[in-house]
Amino acid sequence: EAIYETLHWEPQVLVCAQSNTAVDWISEKLVDRGVPVLRIGNPTRVNDKMLSFTYERRFESHPAYPELWGIRKSIRETGSRMRKGSYSEREGMRSRMSRLRDRATELEIQINTDLFDSARVIASTLVSSNHRLLNGRRFPTLFIDEAAQALEAACWIAIGKADRVILAGDHHQLPPTIK
């Protein structure tokens, strides 16, 4: 509820927890209320209901992805032909590959921007908040759920990305466990 209320005055928040299960549970509740969530982390550790909200799935379903996939395929094919061509042919192919790489980078940036701009909640585990996709991103508010079970060192990873931190959880729960 606190996350939902905070979204009335903030454009985006970061929501973290120690476990994937907790992150998925919170994310599901928000999705059920119509909040756009972008789930960051290893898709193999995300529950089935939240898979379609993972960065990887949303990236692949973006309208610009087929063009990006085609460009990447052209880059691979051009690279293969380059190894077999003469010097003058390789020079032309290098120029083509450079243009293709530039366009691929533009598309990747566009897709990333679209995905992050459309999400009101970025959800990840505390450790996954250090994912390269979140590098350089700041959030007005960070919610840490299951804070009583979170390892302090893991909390600091996410805390560095936020201006304000809200800790939530039952202090009567079990202490942090190290696996």
What function would you assign to each model-found segment?
Residues 120-121, 141:
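Short, Asp-centered acidic motifs that coordinate Mg2+ and/or phosphate
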Residues 1-112, 121:
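ASCE P-loop NTPase motor cores of helicases and related translocases
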Residues 8-11, 19, 33, 113, ...:
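Conserved helicase motor core of SF1/SF2 NTP-dependent helicases
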